[in-house]
Amino acid sequence: MAVIPAKKRGRPRKSVVAEVPYDSLASPVSENSGSKRPRRNASKKAVANFAQLVHAGRDDVINTTQVNNVDDTDDDDFVLNDEGDGEESDNVEIEFENELESTKNEVADLNSSGSGASVRPSGRRNTVQKLRLKKNSTKNMKSSSPGSSLGQKGRPIRLLKDLSSARDKIERIYGLNKEKLLLLAKVKEGFETSVFDFPFKNIQPDSPYFVCLDPPCKKESAYNKVIGDKNRTVYHEINKTEFENMIKLRTKRLKLLIGEVDAEVSTGDKIEFPVLANGKRRGFIYNVGGLVTDIAWLNIEENTDIGKDIQYLAVAVSQYMDEPLNEHLEMFDKEKHSSCIQIFKMNTSTLHCVKVQTIVHSFGEVWDLKWHEGCHAPHLVGCLSFVSQEGTINFLEIIDNATDVHVFKMCEKPSLTLSLADSLITTFDFLSPTTVVCGFKNGFVAEFDLTDPEVPSFYDQVHDSYILSVSTAYSDFEDTVVSTVAVDGYFYIFNPKDIATTKTTVSRFRGSNLVPVVYCPQIYSYIYSDGASSLRAVPSRAAFAVHPLVSRETTITAIGVSRLHPMVLAGSADGSLIITNAARRLLHGIKNSSATQKSLRLWKWDYSIKDDKYRIDSSYEVYPLTVNDVSKAKIDAHGINITCTKWNETSAGGKCYAFSNSAGLLTLEYLS
């Protein structure tokens, strides 16, 4: 008989046993028993006998005749038990007893058949041994990162569903940086119970849950570098008649129905919210008188001269408001005509609002309004930047008026203009106080230094078509990441230091000419629309981890986020504005997401063709999270489409938000 090594776990590759004495089985086995299982008392004795054989020395042999030409040293499939009495000893004992019983059955079959032919080992033995090998290798694996639980599990992560626990998920998508995880813990603790609203005290600097990551343009003062005395914006004042000759805003009054209250508003009129059916809500509706293409808050955190409650809101207005197919609204070719930007001064505490400036320019329609928060000067309100239909980025100084009297100005020369002769700039974002990254009509991406804007730092192709959105993901713990979305439907993220080797595809969706993408710094994630009815979030360092947030039966057209809290606003083509808490989705596990992730409709615009009347519905409606729903998008009246929505991002006014529809009705509310 073959020699059985001692202190080996598992059953060896045994040679054919020619004869086994009946004494070892306690009772004879009949010849016609075949594959019948032996009686239980024989099984117990067989288990005891084979257990003794395992504990025998290497030179001990079974008292049977050894078969010739059998290599008894082939024991490579054994797993040595060198761990002593480890914590898995009980499980190993059970597995070993099961192995012994299986071996006993095979020996019984050999005796009953009387054949000397070799028998192929059962598949169960190989399975158990593979499981044992896997368990031992996992147990002995050393984690590459201290504190990592994923490294100890040794499981590949390819999809979000592979991260079942919240701890594993957070480790994979955010990393193990303790300072970063501490900030995320503050956000989770302070806002995870805030389903549709949040405490005002949590966004105050003295709150233990206060987290505010400043954008790249705010890192340092850059006014002297970017503008200074050489690049002043040139204006000249005009009167109201001259303005009306250049800009044809709406002249007729708009009929409104707010709750149960009928009203008519002319251009420039403001109406506060009446007492609504679901309670008192603080805010107002302002008739801009044209198509609002974008809005932007100047986030003044500390200003002792005017008070912390005073904020400025810039509103870009087009005079072509009632014709969606007007040739002046084209986006793929260069266009030059007159348009205007209105500057509002507002007290976020009392919600007193006054229009202080109207700036007329000839750059065509403008979008991507952004205040350069690093440009400060005593004579300025701020420095406003935007993309225009001319295919340029323009920077304007907004001069501070001595009074709140409304003035009209004509811009003759901007402070700074960025452009290339080969293609039109379509979108941009800040990389630092002195650099911006731009997307172009031809699919290229470029970086401009504002101190030397004539030639870009780089000019590389990323897409094959018109780039719709560029957004920078900034963090104190990783390099800045840039995302781009184009008409072809590709969503890429990359490190601008090395685009070729870092470009990663986040997703691919159907092509569209409206795919909003914004960066939410509190959860280090991009919030974006798929060009249709779904709102999603993806961390910038884990492109595979796409989290659905909201699914609607209409196209999502505008997204608003804040650096102070994780609440996300989403406007849609059917006139709805909804709010959801993205932190509840990203900072929890993937299980029961439909129960924890909800969204709330705040407002809904409607339009009656028969009565030529706009109605705003203030009733709340809760939507559950649904995934993979069939799109049921409908065609709605163009006047109710939400064109833009923005949070105020200051501690004093952090609960204020504004949004506008295509009819030029600007709505502002203080969330309470």
UniProtKB/Swiss-Prot annotation:
Stretches for region Required for DNA-binding: 1-158
Acidic residues bias (residue ranges): 71-100
Record GO biological process: 5S class rRNA transcription by RNA polymerase III; transcription by RNA polymerase III; transcription initiation at RNA polymerase III promoter
Primary location: nucleus
Keywords noted in UniProt: Disulfide bond, DNA-binding, Nucleus, Transcription, Transcription regulation
Family annotation (InterPro entries): GTF3C_component (IPR052416), WD40/YVTN_repeat-like_dom_sf (IPR015943), WD40_repeat_dom_sf (IPR036322)
Subcellular location: Nucleus
GO cellular component: nucleus; transcription factor TFIIIC complex
Gene Ontology MF term list: DNA binding; RNA polymerase III general transcription initiation factor activity
SUPFAM superfamilies tied to this protein: WD40 repeat-like (SSF50978)
Keyword Glycoprotein in record: no
Residue span of region Sufficient for interaction with TFC8: 159-672
Keyword Mitochondrion: no
Region called Disordered, residue ranges: 24-45, 67-156
Signal sequence range: none
Disulfide bridge partners, by residue number: 375-383
Remarks, miscellaneous: Present with 1130 molecules/cell in log phase SD medium.
PANTHER family named among the record's database cross-references: GENERAL TRANSCRIPTION FACTOR 3C POLYPEPTIDE 2, RNA POLYMERASE III TRANSCRIPTION INITIATION FACTOR COMPLEX SUBUNIT
Function recorded in the entry: TFIIIC mediates tRNA and 5S RNA gene activation by binding to intragenic promoter elements. Upstream of the transcription start site, TFIIIC assembles the initiation complex TFIIIB-TFIIIC-tDNA, which is sufficient for RNA polymerase III recruitment and function. Part of the tauB domain of TFIIIC that binds boxB DNA promoter sites of tRNA and similar genes. Cooperates with TFC3 in DNA binding.
Subunit-level organization: Heterodimer with TFC8. Component of the TFIIIC complex composed of TFC1, TFC3, TFC4, TFC6, TFC7 and TFC8. The subunits are organized in two globular domains, tauA and tauB, connected by a proteolysis-sensitive and flexible linker. Interacts with TFC1, TFC3, TFC4 and directly with TFC8.
Protein name in the entry: Transcription factor tau 91 kDa subunit
Lineage start: Eukaryota, Fungi, Dikarya, Ascomycota, Saccharomycotina
